[in-house]
Amino acid sequence: MAVKERVGTVVSDKMEKTVVVAVESRFPHPIYQKTVSRTTRYKAHDEDNSCRVGDRVRITETRPMSRHKRWAIAEVLSHSPKADKSAGSTAPAPEAAAKEVSE
């Protein structure tokens, strides 16, 4: 039996070692033949907590890890530019912010 793989976008990373990945599938409508998009959300295991919202990832089917989690992150295809900015954000010091307000 072949290993199932999906490519999707991380839409939530608020859980420990778990992310929610949205996978979009496109198919023609059986009657009208218009291309229809359907989004399925999978909970996937992220051992290192390395994924952030907006990342493109490849997930593979694994053994059941919990009630809803049966997928694992195989690789991160691309990181979200928004996640890169937040990781290296340089927020102004509180003194500098107070100085700007007083001026």
Curated annotation (Swiss-Prot):
Subunit structure: Part of the 30S ribosomal subunit.
GO cellular component: cytosolic small ribosomal subunit
Protein name per its UniProtKB record: Small ribosomal subunit protein uS17
SUPFAM superfamilies xrefs: Nucleic acid-binding proteins
Entry's family note: Belongs to the universal ribosomal protein uS17 family.
Lineage top rank: taxon: Bacteria
Gene: rpsQ
Role description: One of the primary rRNA binding proteins, it binds specifically to the 5'-end of 16S ribosomal RNA.
Example of a GO biological process term: translation
GO MF, any single term: rRNA binding
Keywords: Ribonucleoprotein, Ribosomal protein, RNA-binding, rRNA-binding
Organism annotation: Parasynechococcus marenigrum (strain WH8102)
NCBIfam families, per database record: PRK05610.1, uS17_bact
PANTHER family assigned to the protein according to its UniProt record, in alphabetical order: 40S RIBOSOMAL PROTEIN S11 FAMILY MEMBER (PTHR10744), SMALL RIBOSOMAL SUBUNIT PROTEIN US17M (PTHR10744:SF1)
Annotated stretches, region: Disordered: 78-103
